[in-house]
Amino acid sequence: MDSVPRLTSILTLVLSGLWHVGLTATNYNCDDPLASFLSPKAFSSSSDLTGSSSSAQLNGRMGTGGWSPENSSAHQWLQLDLGNRVEITAVATQGRYGSSDWVTSYCLIFSDTGHNWQQYKQGDSIWTFIGNMNANSVVHHKLLHAVRARFVRFVPLEWNPNGKIGMRVEVYGCFYKSDVADFDGRSSLLYRFNQKTMSTLKDVISLKFKSMQGDGVLFHGEGQRGDHITLELQNGRLALYLNLDDSKARLSSITPSAILGSLLDDQHWHSVLLERVGKQANFTVDRNTQHFRTNGDTDALDIDYELSFGGIPVPSKPGTFLKKNFQGCIENLYYNGVNIIDLAKRRKHQIYSGNVTFSCSEPQIVPITFVNSRSSYLLLPGTPQIDGLSVSFQFRTWNEDGLLLSTELSEGSGTLLLILEGGTLRLLIKNVAGHGTESLTGRSLNNGQWHSVNINARRNRVTLTLDNDPASPALETPWLQIYSGYSYYFGGCPDNLTDSQCLNPIKAFQGCMRLIFIDNQPKDLISVQQGSLGNFSDLHIDLCSIKDRCFPNYCEHGGHCTQTWTNFYCNCSNTGYTGATCHDSIYEQSCEVYRHRGNTAGYFYVDSDGSGPLRPLQVYCNVTEDKIWMTVQHNNTELTWIQGSNTEKPYVMNLNYGGSMEQLEALIDGSEHCEQEVTYYCRRSHLLNTPDGAPFAWWTGRSNERHPYWGGYFPGDQKCGCGLEESCLEMSNDTGFLSFKDHLPVTQIIISDTNRSNSEAAWRIGPLRCYGDRHFWNAVSFSTEAAYLHIPTFHAEFSADISFFFKTTALSGVFLENLGVKNFLRLEMSSPSEVIFAIDVGNGPMELLVQSPYPLNDNQWHYIQAERNIKETLLHVDNLPKSMRMASEEGHFLLQLNSQLFVGGTSSRQKGFLGCIRSLHLNGQKVDLEERAKITSGVRPGCAGHCNSYGRNCQNGGKCVEKHIGYTCDCTNSPYEGPFCKKEISALFYSGTSVTYMFQEPYPVTKNTSLSSSAIYKDTAPSKEAITLSFMTAQAPTLLLYLNFSSQNFLAILLSRNGSLQIQYRLSKEESHVFTISTENLANRRVHQVKMSRDGPELSIQMDQQLFSYNFPPEVEFQTVRSLILGKVTETLGLDPEVAKANTLGFVGCLSSVQYNHIAPLKAALRHASISPVTVQGTLTESSCDSMIDSDVTGVTTVYSPSVPFGKTDEHEPLTNTIQSDSAFIGGVIAIVTFITFCVLGIMVHFLYQQKQSHRTNQMKEKEYPDNLDSSFRNDIDLQNTAIECKREYFI
């Protein structure tokens, strides 16, 4: 972020703070008792004992000593009329004097008119006040947010179970000054400037408003150059349009700069504050603030002539407006410190008002709320047998389905139903015979807006009108005469109704209704409340308690919010996040974590801050055996040539990495090392000037600062790395790595000296490359129960997620604890098999428990994730089933903590944790535990013993090696490689390929000569043998592996002519042991695995999934091993005749994962041929056996060795196109000369090649298999059985 927005943001915040301080300073002593001096008539109630409400003042002892209703039940209330609108800052209560009657909890509602009540809330929750525990003590509550009202009601929720409801009350506050203007929807106020144009660099506009209409302009101003500012109600929300000096933008074609609020057409006061400094602006509606940057080219707002309030009048056309005017009341309207309404009341010349009055007219509207989807209903009487029927009302809801109206027509002739189904109105009329008709109208009527419904019927014609639409359809009912009935059920039906007076084919309605008319007569809902009209169940009368659960939007990371009356839901599709509120990232935080989960190389999305605000970024993870590299590409990694630039017009290239600078900084800061390769070529072009002069080329990094140093050197010096080391090979080339993390990544390169004759330069900036996760292995050890780490307070009001690894041998201990005044959070291991997550957000303590079937104090790493949001609380331990608890639909939901976060202990220094904790995340933020442990007694940085937990990740004989940060897998004694020894090493063998491993010296198979397990001595006869190999071939018979013992004894693994596996042991001249595995033909171009192990005389053979066992005779003596051969045995002297048959064509196919005891001969040949006792003859090509399974096997029949420049023509194929002419002689001469020339060249190449690699006879190639591979796969040679020496054969 540049410095200007930072400065303007600070100024905006300062201005906002001063503004609010000014407002609160006027009410500094607003705590006077307001009820003590009220007359008895100011007190009223839902019901009372004789005159009890008039003696309900605090500390009052007269009369009955306080208020008690006739019966203690729900929906009772005590009301105070404070005479005028006042500011209420506190309340206090007592029980009824000298009794056992008191209220233990209650809520407050307030109103300006005594109707259309509003519930007192904190945040988005209806606030419950703690009441009394006896009759005489006073319980005082300071309101977190002051309210302004004339009427206030105390509504008891719970009371003494051994008594009744009893209350004495007091209200504290002060006088409230208010300037009000009433707009009738056809008028406006004009504030005219003293000069033509009002130009402002900063603005503060504040007001309050109330309205029953969802649309209307509150204020507007514009200038001739495109400046404009407009605040407009749109569907019950406030849209702000603000533009600075952009003539292209027009109000009708631009989108709002900000939209805030919801359900603002509820006839309650709503506050608005707009603060602007330059292009930075804060827009606040009812304590919800949105910060934004304005459109436009300048910092000044230029408004011409006037500002209009309440509408946008058309110049020279009085009474004409561009948009719908505002209808309602505006209070305390200030524009840059000017009280606009006060000026209008005093008829100042700057103000023009048309039909604006200065008192707020309050419509006497009584809304009702249907609370319960099963039991809410309202019964109102009709006038029976009137010719026709007329019903109208307004409703608003979030539910798609619900019964709106059910009535039985006069004399039981039929039924009329009005249903909301799938957000559409459905009118259904049936007669007693079952004939019916229906009408559908509207869609998405569950959008929370007020909708008006009017049903008019006369005789055989019914009309349903929605939202005053004149094009509403009419229904004809020739089979039914419609007459008004006795009863009208709104919202639902009573449970005890047994006849057809009320039918409900769908669930009850949840929502609000108002303005109910039956037979063109309004219904008095206050009379319903008092019990003198109709009947009801589970209604809130005289208030609409609709709540927009999607505002503010608690779906994080762009999740889409939908809602019903009681709940909201988040659609997290295409966000990269999951969970009830789209809080949890589906991606890992680094390549290290992907590696830990078993991934190797590929493109991955990395979310550096987890559940934090930063979006995931795509990177390339390359997991090698020693480092895990993370690569981020940018938009120009190719070599780029530059000409024609100079200091006045330099060449500039901006680099785009596909993410924000915040994302890149998080990746870099979380890595151990980062680098970018920089290459610069030049000709007649300077890179640097003098060591102190201005450079001709430079680059900028993350903070937009110039950096004149280049690859391999240090920040601050105009040098390059090879110049420092005096190793520059070319004067015109500078190549090196930038590795100072605070300056990376390179975001821009500037070159300014390529405009001279024949002058040019070229540059290349490589991708950003990093390795090492600084946090994943960040661990601490707690050695005493009293030790803990201090972390700043965990601020997680709406969402909290905590994750970490731990290991311990203790029986119990507290991992984390954070306290608040009333709230707390604690995570602990309560026993060796139980983890508890305890939390209290104000609704009482709640505990989640996960029980483990295995002990958690086994000194192994275990993972814990605890999460709490406003919808649910969850606890995960390892991969065990999670524990979950849904949040209450109503009640407190803000987690407010104020103490420090204790890690590894508690504030009481008891029940501390003994063991290790690592990789602690708090709402995605990484906590550097090791750094804090350095200055904390009883806590030690780091934790050893990673291999105890993760050693199992090293597979196929790999050995886990402990490191300070994490671990590595040593694959020395494994035929596999890779970070987890999971990558097989395989190669293609041709008919002449032979790999021989000699057991003569204790040669290691890797460069690590200290590993003695990698060799076998020639004079040692192994008591145990283990052989593993995988193969794929289409040739049979063929030899797979040959072990040469002393005295012409051997072990051979081969495929017989029918493709079955055969293992031959020859341990003496007199006797051989032959084991034949009678399975299907294994020469079927599929990968098969052979495992053979011998322990003394016990032999086991596994072919794929089949296992066989055998015992050698006790007199058998096993021989020492001299060599191991894969493929063709080239020294055939003394070779067993049957083995010789299989060896005739060698092995053509693929071998992989070959291992004899701790020897991996194929790995030695392909990876460590220069230091291993291995010899390769013929062509050996590294490849993957699995990739060959479905390959095309119809290739060319000839395979060439790379050491021979020409292949031989197949002897069985005749030559063609032979020319019989006199030119044959000339051609022959040319051929002979050519042949001799190539022979000489071949001898020279062969000689040089032998000088270079004398230990090998042929070249190995590491490449993909060639297209001509499968020529020999088609060869099938029929070898006759030959009599051999006496053998023991075992057919298994």
Curated annotation (Swiss-Prot):
List residues traversing the bilayer.
1225-1245
Q: Classify the source by domain of life.
A: Eukaryota
Localization recorded for this chain is: Membrane
Q: Which residues constitute the signal peptide according to the record?
A: 1-24
**Where in the body, by tissue, does this protein show up?**
Expressed in brain.
List the keywords (alphabetical): Cell adhesion, Disulfide bond, EGF-like domain, Glycoprotein, Membrane, Repeat, Signal, Transmembrane, Transmembrane helix
Checking InterPro entries in the record gives:
ConA-like_dom_sf, EGF-like_dom, FA58C, Fibrinogen-like_C, Fibrinogen_a/b/g_C_dom, Galactose-bd-like_sf, Laminin_G, Neurexin-related_CASP
Has keyword Thylakoid?
Answer: no
Q: What is this protein called?
A: Contactin-associated protein like 5-2
Q: Which organism is it from?
A: Mus musculus
